[in-house]
Amino acid sequence: MQPTRQTPSATAAISGGGGASAGAIETDALVIGAGPVGLFQVFQLGLQDLRCHVVDVLSQPGGQCAELYPAKPIYDIPALPVCSGTELVERLLQQVAPFDPVLHLGQEVESLAPRADGRFDIGTSAGTQFIARAVFIAAGVGAFSPRRLKLPGLDTLAASCVSHQAPDVSACQGQTVLVHGGDDRALDWACRLAEHGVAVSLLYRRDVYPAAPEQVRRLELLASQGRVTRRVGQPTQARADAAGQLTGVDHLDPSGQTHHEPATRLFVSLGLSPRLGPLSSWGLQMERKLLDVEPSRFETSLPGVYAVGDINSYPGKLKLIVCGFHEATLAAWAAAHRLRPDAPHHLEYTTSSARLQRLLGVLPRGAE
């Protein structure tokens, strides 16, 4: 069972405001960022019996791991001598599944404001509204936005023809797809489409790709089987029919010759640009674009709002995934104490605690 995922089209558009809108989603905790640290934050909150919704601007969970190095090996995760970014994210999604978090993907948190009752109003770029008892900012180095392709003819195309996000394989069936880019994301998109029987070409300015060796070998195998067509060159013009539907892309090869590549769908991966975004306007104390936190609780200058992972700053800070896991653990404990000040808080172990094992689904509810 995987966490529930909602795209902007699947979430209700609620008008903003500080009141308790009938359509606002009420939750124990809202986690901003679905990277490894954000996902582990969900797990630690689940152990405190605090339920979560998660918002991320990217179209898939995983943050930098999924977008920047999905196939590159990671060697410093405890008990995993080596794993890829994709594998790490998949394992974390499996780990949080017992707590049924809802992932709101492809939207950015735009507003955060404290309420008189101690909770927080949060609004996203998709119009989704939340009322949360605690907020956890796990935004990494900021919200990632894809670098946009600027190409003559592109702005006249129907919106469905061009995307800077990962392709939906099922929606690409029967289409002729051109992927532009040479990084891990571009190669993964082209390979995944080809592996599902989609006619796909890959266009990059060089015949050497700045991608993980595993991805390059995967591409080369598919190309040798005639399942991916590789082109070298720079795109110069998007072509469309009278209805604004993409018909192909002209490109200039290294010798200066112009070629036309037929395509009905264009997917662009030119890298991602992190930006701080609206976070800087929320009134939180910052230094050099990082959130100041108290390192025993990882609480920001606004009580009830916590920051974990690469977005925070404190003496001795190390920007490592494993350090973010530690921060998420202490932040979850701090939030539980704040939200339930009169409840006993004892350190429990998942190996022996029946309560934790019930939360994890290892024991049925009501079992001793």
Swiss-Prot record:
Catalytic activity: 2 reduced [2Fe-2S]-[ferredoxin] + NADP(+) + H(+) = 2 oxidized [2Fe-2S]-[ferredoxin] + NADPH
Chain positions recorded as FAD binding sites: D56, Q64, Y69, V109, F144, D310, T351
Keyword Flavoprotein: yes
Cofactor(s) needed for function: FAD
The entry's keywords: FAD, Flavoprotein, NADP, Oxidoreductase
SUPFAM superfamilies from the UniProt entry: FAD/NAD(P)-binding domain
EC nos: 1.18.1.2
Family matches, as Pfam families: Pyr_redox_3
Cofactor annotation comment: Binds 1 FAD per subunit.
MF terms (GO), sorted A to Z: ferredoxin-NADP+ reductase activity; flavin adenine dinucleotide binding; NADP binding
Family of this protein: Belongs to the ferredoxin--NADP reductase type 2 family.
PANTHER family according to UniProt: THIOREDOXIN REDUCTASE 1-RELATED-RELATED (PTHR48105)
Subunit structure: Homodimer.
Protein name (database record): Ferredoxin--NADP reductase
Species name: Leptothrix cholodnii (strain ATCC 51168 / LMG 8142 / SP-6)
